[in-house]
């Protein structure tokens, strides 16, 4: 039997999963990665630690599976998006820590571009809004802040890319400097209609094109893993941004299907087919994937920066829980939040507000407020943000989203999913396999390796675990959403 090795490199950990041809998990391994916070608003990773965590978990997963690497037909990679790495081509060593998607250090530069009237050009070419979230300004910052960075980039001494590019470079022993269209579409440097790096955008951010990887289809030939890593050469047959991978893993492969991933952040994506639909409500237009030589497929996306990360803050910052799952027990101890509202804008607000100056806010506290109320308000704060995204997406499409497919670690919380259904007034549908990010990468790698002939052959893979239906009245829902809007207003422009 053939196997697929999925490498899932996320914001807080790296996971490797071995799947069989039926897409059943044979074995897996996971390792946390360290986030560094050198200054307020700055978030970094050690790119070598990321590489070592991926390599070690891959070896561990293969060993646990009791197979040899020769039975692995393909490697599929999925990764945290926007995070950017710059390294020396000769040594393969990073020249600076990776700047993470959550990092806000380039807020002022983005504001200056907006004031100069650049956002229309950027949005038309990339589908994105001028925000420090995306890779271009991070890459520009690195080149400007390392010794001779710009000169070294222009001379061809340096290479750059998102996490997929970095991992493929290391896996292939430096023989393949490549990214896929889904990751490239998040850099703010690729024209999403042509699928090529855009010369005007490279000029805007002062980034030499020679530093960037080749853009490849999501599913196809992205290089070959060097035999020194696993004892045999293995083809890399997919690379895909984590949210697009989850969209594929949920089999949202037809226009109109929608999913939300609850991870470090929350990400709502709706498949729009081969049409790059522009948003009038400050959502993003992004490439979903490209399978082989088929046309590019697109999605509309809303991004929330703080999802599961808000629960981590309860654990690591406030210390009111010892582990993330404890939030459910604590929050279940009260019937509601007691009028407490928590806006988890710790690193600003994403869609549809795009306010890097917003900050985390807790409102409605009284002497009767307890840690349980704060815990419940945190879960509600996550769900309120997703409700904002759904409302914006429905305005864009003019159509009601009747079912929201959910995945990601935090969706294992029945309480959070019930709160989400209540605040949406919609069915929330959770699959049996909630880790659809790695699954999507495995599916795309299998397609690239010819294990399955087409997407239709995968249609029977997905099965539903539970459907959550609303349990509150429309009046209750509207009142809570109205108060949430007031809370968001208080949190905005705090640092302005």
Question: For the regions a protein language model found, what residue spans apply to each?
Answer:
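Active-site core segments that coordinate phosphate-bearing ligands/cofactors
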Residues: 5-7, 107, 114-177, 183, ...
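N-terminal glycine/serine-rich phosphate-binding loop of ATP-dependent small-molecule kinases
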Residues: 1-96, 124, 230-238, 421-428, ...
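Carbohydrate-associated surface elements
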Residues: 103
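Short linear loop/turn motifs
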Residues: 212-221, 328-332
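Short beta-strand-loop/turn "lid" adjacent to the catalytic site in phosphate-handling enzymes
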Residues: 63-100, 129-135, 168-191, 216, ...
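Active-site donor-binding loop signature of nucleotide-sugar glycosyltransferases
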Residues: 31-33, 217, 289, 470
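Short acidic capping loops at alpha-helix termini that bridge into adjacent secondary structure
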Residues: 21, 69-73, 97, 209-214, ...
């Amino acid at each position: 039997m053939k196997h697929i090795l999925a490498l899932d490199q996320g914001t807080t950990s790296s996971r490797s999963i071995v799947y069989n041809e039926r897409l059943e998990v044979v074995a897996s391994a996971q390792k946390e990665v360290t986030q560094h916070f050198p200054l307020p608003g700055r978030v970094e990773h050690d790119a070598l630690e990321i590489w070592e965590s991926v390599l070690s978990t891959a070896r561990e997963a293969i060993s646990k599976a009791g197979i040899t690497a020769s039975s692995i037909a393909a490697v599929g990679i999925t990764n945290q998006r926007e995070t950017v790495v710059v390294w020396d081509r000769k040594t393969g060593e990073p020249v600076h820590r990776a700047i993470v998607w959550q990092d806000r250090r380039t807020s002022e530069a983005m504001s200056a571009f907006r004031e100069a009237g650049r956002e229309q050009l950027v949005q038309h070419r990339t589908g994105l809004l001028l925000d420090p979230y995306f890779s271009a300004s991070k890459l520009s910052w690195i080149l400007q802040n390392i010794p001779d960075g710009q000169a070294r980039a222009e001379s061809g001494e340096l290479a750059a890319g998102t996490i997929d590019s970095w991992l493929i470079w290391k896996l292939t022993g430096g023989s393949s400097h490549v990214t896929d269209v889904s990751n490239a579409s998040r850099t703010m440097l690729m024209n999403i209609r042509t699928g090529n790096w855009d010369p005007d955008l490279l000029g805007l951010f002062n980034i030499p094109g020679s530093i960037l990887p080749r853009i490849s289809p999501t599913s196809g030939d992205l290089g070959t893993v060097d035999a020194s890593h696993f004892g045999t050469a293995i083809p890399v047959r997919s690379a895909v941004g984590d949210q697009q991978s989850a969209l594929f893993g949920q089999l949202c492969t037809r226009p109109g299907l929608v999913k939300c991933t609850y991870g470090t952040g929350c990400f709502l994506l709706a498949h729009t087919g081969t049409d790059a639909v522009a948003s009038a409500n400050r959502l993003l237009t992004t490439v979903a994937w490209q399978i082989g030589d088929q046309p590019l497929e697109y999605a509309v996306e809303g991004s929330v920066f703080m999802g599961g990360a808000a629960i981590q803050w309860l654990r690591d910052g406030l210390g009111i829980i010892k582990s993330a799952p404890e939030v459910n027990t604590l929050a279940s101890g009260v019937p509601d939040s007691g009028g407490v509202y928590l806006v988890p804008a710790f690193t600003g607000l994403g869609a549809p507000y795009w306010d890097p100056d917003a900050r985390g806010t807790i409102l409605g506290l009284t002497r009767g407020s307890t840690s349980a109320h704060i815990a419940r308000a945190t879960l509600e704060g996550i769900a309120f943000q997703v409700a904002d995204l759904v409302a914006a997406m429905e305005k864009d499409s003019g159509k009601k989203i009747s079912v929201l497919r959910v995945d990601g670690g935090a969706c294992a919380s029945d309480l959070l999913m019930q709160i989400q259904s209540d605040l949406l007034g919609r069915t929330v549908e959770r699959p049996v396999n909630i880790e659809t990010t790695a699954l999507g990468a495995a599916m795309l790698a299998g397609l690239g390796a010819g294990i399955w002939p087409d997407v239709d052959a995968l249609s029977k893979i997905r099965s539903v675990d539970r459907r959550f239906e609303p349990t509150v009245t429309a009046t209750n829902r509207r009142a809570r959403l109205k108060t949430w809007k007031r809370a968001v207003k208080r949190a905005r422009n705090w640092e302005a």
